């Protein structure tokens, strides 16, 4: 049986963050499932929703922000201060990290506009 970490170890850590991905690998998952969105300046970021409202302290659509603007928002907002501030990771950041890890990646492109 294969164990997939949905949005990383999202039951214990902020979803789709580098911390959630690292903790999922440490816990022994075989695969990480993540979601990607495209910013206004064409940077691929790891985030489930088209809007940033649910998982960050910002509002609006990912596509309306450049990555420089987007990374100011706290991707750990839902955890009420339990974790330090975390930026939304870029897909490149994830790829640079995961290339040395013993897991596969399931990537979902979540958008209704492309």
Region spans (language model):
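Phosphate-group recognition and catalysis centered on beta-loop-alpha active-site segments
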Residues: 1-114
């Amino acid at each position: 049986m294969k164990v997939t970490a949905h949005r990383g170890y999202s039951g214990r850590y902020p979803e789709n963050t580098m911390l959630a991905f690292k903790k999922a690998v440490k816990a022994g998952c075989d695969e990480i499932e993540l979601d990607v969105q495209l910013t206004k300046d064409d940077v691929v970021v790891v985030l489930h929703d088209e809007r940033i409202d649910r998982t960050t302290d910002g509002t609006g659509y990912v596509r309306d922000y450049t990555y420089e603007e987007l990374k100011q928002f706290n991707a750990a907002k839902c955890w009420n201060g339990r974790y330090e501030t975390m930026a939304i990771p870029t897909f490149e950041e994830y790829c640079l990290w995961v290339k040395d890890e013993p897991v596969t990646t399931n990537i979902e492109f979540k958008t209704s506009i492309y």
